[in-house]
Each structure stands twice: as C-alpha cells, then as structure tokens.
Amino acid sequence: MEFVVDKSRKTVVITAEFAAERDLVWKAYTEPELLDQWWAPKPFSSRTKAMDFREGGRRFYAMVSPEGQESWAVQKYTSITPKTNFKFLNAFADENENPQLPGSDWDLNFSEQNGKTTITTTIYNESRERMEMLMSMGFKEGTEAAYDSLKELLATLSQARGQSNG
C-alpha cells in the first residue's frame, strides 16, 4: 500500500493492489454485508445502519469498539461509474445522522490488470485541520489494518467463486 499525504493540497492518496478481479473488489466496496466485514480496522467492527448505493444515495454506519462504543459517519454518494469509479462526501455524524462538518471528498478508482485490481483513493479534505486530525487518529494504520481484512475477505470470496465455477 502506498500512502501519500500532501498537506499543501489537503489530500491523502492511497494506492493498493489486491489479488482479485475488479468486479469482486467492487462488490466488497458497494455491498453492505461485505463492506462491514472489512471497513473497520480490527478489533473494531463496522455496522451499516442504512445504505443506498446510487448517485444521491448514502451509507450511514458506525465503527464499533470492542467495548461497544459507536462512532458514526455518513457517506453521501455524488458520482458512480459502475466498476471503475465512485465518489462520496464523508463526514462524521451523530447517531441521528446529523453530519459534523467539515467533511472530506473521496474519489475511488478501480482498475484491473492480469486478474489483480488496483484501487487509488484520493481524499480531499475541506480543511488542513481535519486532515491532520484524521492522521493523528491513526488513519494510516487503520487503513492498513482494514486493507489486510479486505485482502482476507477477497481471498475467501475468490476461492468460493472458483469452487462454484468448477
């Protein structure tokens, strides 16, 4: 995983490669029952309360600590090009889905070559302070841990897919 922080542009760019076909990786990002299996870094878990994956739709979810403490967030989908790109505004929220602005704009690009999928995620922060707060909360380490869980999930799904095709 490559993780680049550009403070002058208030951006974080994350590039990662996964040993899975793009349609499977896309599903892991766009289907709540799969997304909840990897989005939160262990030992936290992700719990989606509502998700409508379409332009103008949203995902409302909580990161849940091992002690049961919930940290809520909302993602509002602004653009979707199936299996290649989607964008959303991400903001922390309270349990009633009231966003705590400023948020950040996420732009995710999916490409496949030789059965491997590369995801490039560009996160544009509305303020440098928000970006620095995310980094101080362990965003890089959390992303690495979540991607480790995603790799495990994709391996399991790829194996199951191979068995069902055989």
Kindly give the residue locations of the regions a language model identified:
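Glycine-rich portal/gate segments that line the openings of hydrophobic small-molecule binding cavities
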Residues: R47-A91
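Beta-strand/loop substructures that line and gate deep hydrophobic ligand-binding cavities in soluble
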Residues: L89, E95-E141
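A generic structural micro-feature
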Residues: D6-S8, F53, E67-S71, N98-P102, ...
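A short, structured loop/turn motif at beta-sheet edges
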Residues: R22-D23, D52-R54, T78-N85, N109-T118
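A conserved amphipathic terminal alpha-helix motif
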Residues: E126-G166
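Hydrophobic ligand-binding cavity/cleft-lining segments
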Residues: M1-S45
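Short, surface-exposed coil-to-beta transition loops
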Residues: V13, S46, E70-Q75, L101-W106
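Hydrophobic pocket/interface hotspot
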Residues: V25, L35, R59, Y77, ...
